[in-house]
């Protein structure tokens, strides 16, 4: 299920069927002008890729730093995930959503980086050593 703004009953057409029982999280509509996908890999921002929107808007790096600080306090955080951030029409940097690495696309991340990204999460899920975790070789 993808996020969308529901303004009338017609907007619900195609959102599911009677056999499914989705949990739906509602919020007020936000005017997001630009979005980026932050790839989080072992508690660090691995890369940030533009997702969509108006190039005139840019994110506040101090907000990203705070998001990461808060993320690191989450005890059961994934080894790899994505955090989508956006900038609103009034230039506020916000978290749009967070998703597990195994269910996110590469969105322009280089192939070898994406492979390492996915490997980290799968290794964590299956409680195995990550064969592509090269951090152990760094001084």
Indicate residue ranges for each PLM-predicted region:
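A long amphipathic alpha-helix within ATP-dependent nucleotide-binding catalytic cores
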Residues: 47-95, 114-138
């Amino acid at each position: 299920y993808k996020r969308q703004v529901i303004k009338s009953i017609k907007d619900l057409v195609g959102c599911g069927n009677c056999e499914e029982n989705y949990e739906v999280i509602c919020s007020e509509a936000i005017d997001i002008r630009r979005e980026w996908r932050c790839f989080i890999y072992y508690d660090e921002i691995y890369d940030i890729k533009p997702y969509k929107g108006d190039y005139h808007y840019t994110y506040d790096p101090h907000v990203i730093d705070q998001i990461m600080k808060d993320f690191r306090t989450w005890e059961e955080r994934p080894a790899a995930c994505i955090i989508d951030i956006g900038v609103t029409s009034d230039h506020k940097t916000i978290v749009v959503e967070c998703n597990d690495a195994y269910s996110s696309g590469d969105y322009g991340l280089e192939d070898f980086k994406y492979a390492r990204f996915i490997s980290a999460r799968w290794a964590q899920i299956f409680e195995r050593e990550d064969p592509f975790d090269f951090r152990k070789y760094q001084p």
